[in-house]
Amino acid sequence: MDPSLLRERELFKKRALSTPAVEKRSVSSEASSSKKKKAKLEHGGSSGSKQNSDHSNGSFNLKALSGSSGYKFGVLAKIVNYMKTRHQRGDTHPLTLEEILDETQHLDIGLKQKQWLMSEALVNNPKIEVVDGKYAFKPKYNLKDKKALLRLLDQHDQRGLGGILLEDIEEGLPNSQKAVKALGDQILFVNRPDKKKILFFNDKSCQFSVDEEFQKLWRSVTVDSMDEEKIEEYLKRQGISSMQDSGPKKVAPIQRRKKPASQKKRRFKTHNEHLAGVLKDYSDIAPGK
């Protein structure tokens, strides 16, 4: 045989040995793997169907989480919201814990949750106050009627405290919408940039006409980027003193000076006391030349 053909044959064998071979799976292994996959799918489907049936039957609810902290705080939030709504309806009398749980449909909670509500949750909640062992809603402003609302707005205006949020009034005044509508032009509404409404007392004694040119000048001045110190410095440069300089000044208490302690005369020990009548002092006589 030609030696060149033999060399080519040897090279072909080496290349064949170096290249990886891909073998086909046997039919039995493929069948077993497909059976395993089907079994897993059937098991997952059965568990999912069980969960779906539980949801459809209504067995999965908050009561299943009765031992968790989320359930406790959910009950607390529901109680506070209920006490708020009944206060806004005009039912301001306090209730016992059993009455609250009955009206909120939570009589089936455990003893630990009841103890937690009585000893910690309701007592320390800023929106709940305890009155003779009973619980009532505690609004920011406890208002009885429209007259109380008008007095509160007038007090805020006189003290320079500004207005009051409408949501705070709705929280503390029963049937607040009727009361606000009945006051009419005695109050003013101002909308904040965050779309919250603020109520102000409409002091009719302060109503006067202002020149339009002055209004334009007033609105053209922007002080958003300036703080109180910068505004005060600018006013001082213009020769304008702030209101706090013209107000009553506090009198500083007079500090009494402490008297210096009297110095005791120092006593010197004298020597040669037995020669007091014999010795003479010659310091006044000038020395002779």
UniProtKB/Swiss-Prot annotation:
Tetramer of two alpha and two beta chains. Interacts with FACT subunit SUPT16H. Interacts with ATF7IP. Interacts with SND1. Part of TBP-based Pol II pre-initiation complex (PIC), in which Pol II core assembles with general transcription factors and other specific initiation factors including GTF2E1, GTF2E2, GTF2F1, GTF2F2, TCEA1, ERCC2, ERCC3, GTF2H2, GTF2H3, GTF2H4, GTF2H5, GTF2A1, GTF2A2, GTF2B and TBP; this large multi-subunit PIC complex mediates DNA unwinding and targets Pol II core to the transcription start site where the first phosphodiester bond forms. Disulfide bonds: none annotated. This is General transcription factor IIE subunit 2. The modification N6-acetyllysine is found at K72. The modification N-acetylmethionine is found at M1. Residues 17-61, 242-274 are annotated as: Disordered. It comes from Bos taurus (Bovine). Residues 48-60 have a biased composition (Polar residues). The lineage of its organism: Eukaryota, Metazoa, Chordata, Craniata, Vertebrata. Belongs to the TFIIE beta subunit family.
